[in-house]
Amino acid sequence: MALWIFCPRVRIQGAELMAARGPLLIVANHPDSFLDAIILGAYYPRKLHFLARGDVFRKPIYGFLLRSIGMIPIHRAREGREHLHLNEGTFQESVEVLRRGDGLLIFIEGICLLTHEIQPFKKGATRILEAAHTAGIQPLVHVVGMGYSDFRAFGKVVNISIEVFSAKAVFDHARHRLDFNESVRVQMLRLVDVPAEGVSLRKGLFYLLNLPYFRLLSSFVWRRTAGTVFYDSVLFGALMFTYPIYLVAFAAALHGIFEVPMLITMLALPIGFRLTSIRVVTK
């Protein structure tokens, strides 16, 4: 339900490819931080493991939580070269994911800048594929382009385009890594499709009933994520974990005053907001 409200329209071109079985490497662009992984993980009908920036794993509690949802740390030079040697373990763990026949998602740009402009590719995807081929594993490769109607506003239209990698991945020479990245770039540039629509909020009853909670939460998240690219993903996570608490508290208050059954209130508040307050409109 969280994505149904936060992203009221998600279009998927090539959705039939999501049913692929066996080892799968998903190579995607990275326009909107952790929200990209959340959306792809929600719509692929299989467990996905994700490669995520290694610095967020350094606090033990964060590392435990991120690993519990299938994330694997990958370390970048900008986070400290002393951590780069840990990537050997990352690539080995990624190969084991593929060996089990699971899905692995990597954002090949290695950085998120809240833009649909494709950034220079890193070597992570080629390193994983090369190691997999050496181990006798030939994963299917999906190239994914993601486009958002907005990076900051509540409510998004999301376009996802998926294709099978159109060239043969061979890594007999260092030059082949560059060839792979260039082939993916050409394919990805064609797949990124920024929606022509946006989301408008209609100020009705259900909007007003949710407004105090959302204003308070979004202001708090905005302050905590100022100067970063994490506003969307942190807001979504905060909504997912705290909105049920708000629903219970609101339903309990309404039940105490008017004896309205709590279950009815807890269902009516989010569904009514989604159906009456959120509109997809042409920009």
Language-model segments: residues:
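Membrane-water interface of transmembrane alpha-helices
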Residues: 210-219
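Acidic, His- and aromatic-enriched active-site or binding-groove loops in soluble protein domains
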Residues: 164-175
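Transmembrane alpha-helical segments and their cytosolic interface motifs
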Residues: 200-209
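Soluble catalytic domains of membrane acyltransferases
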Residues: 4-166, 204, 218-230, 236-282
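Long, charge-rich alpha-helical interaction segments
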Residues: 174-182, 186-197
